[in-house]
Amino acid sequence: METGQQFLMLKNSININSKLSFHLFNDGFFFNSNSESNYFLFEDINLSIENELLNFLKFNDINNSNEPKIVFFDSPSMFIPSKLHDHKNSKQFLSNYTGLKSNHKVVFDITDDEKICVIYQLNKEIEKTLTKSFTKLNFKHYTTILYNNLKEYSKSNSDSIMKLFVNLQKDKFDLFLIKNQNLIAYNSFPQSNADDFMYYLFALIEQYKLSENSFDLLFLDRIEVFENYYSTIKNFHDKIIFLEKEEALKVNNDHPSPYFLNII
């Protein structure tokens, strides 16, 4: 049952706003600048090879005085309360959650509210070439950005209703369960169709014993390619909200995580 679409504004005050950014995925990267906005495969432009990166930057008229934002999508992250996190144990924490990749190192972000350490893996070769190419860099995992944005949204929408936020991506999706501005749960699940999405979504709903009227379900954006997902969930839950921004939605089917097109 659907009570009618609701559209709310997601504050964008803490978003990555620089025009220059690299979004790193397993098979390639999405590059955004004043002159270029496209997805490139590593087999065509390998960022871990210094000459290839330098030629690419030269072609796009980018020099080392720029400060690009490097956003990592190529490995999962783990959320640890800051008060429980010892940076010396980051590798051990993460190894209990996901397999550690060769030629990667374990790093972490601190969320803006300083409550969460986001632990993840970073490709050392790509870090090396980027560091040589720019004087200053800003590294961040995409889930850190999501958390910061959702906490900012929660500040202006501080009712006591539990909120389950959904970030749909090409082959996975993220769930953030938040109540009274506090993170209750975060997880990321694989998906290739609406059935996968529904399975994992309701598994989390059942795990936290959420009754139908006890929470709002909020999608970060309304993306055309996921319309059948929205239609399916509307048959089971009536508190559905789409977070829309003032800016027009950018459409680029090559970006594996469409929400991030709106904040680059």
Model feature map: region roles:
Residues M1-I264:
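Hydrophobic/aromatic-enriched cytosolic interaction surfaces used to assemble or bind macromolecules
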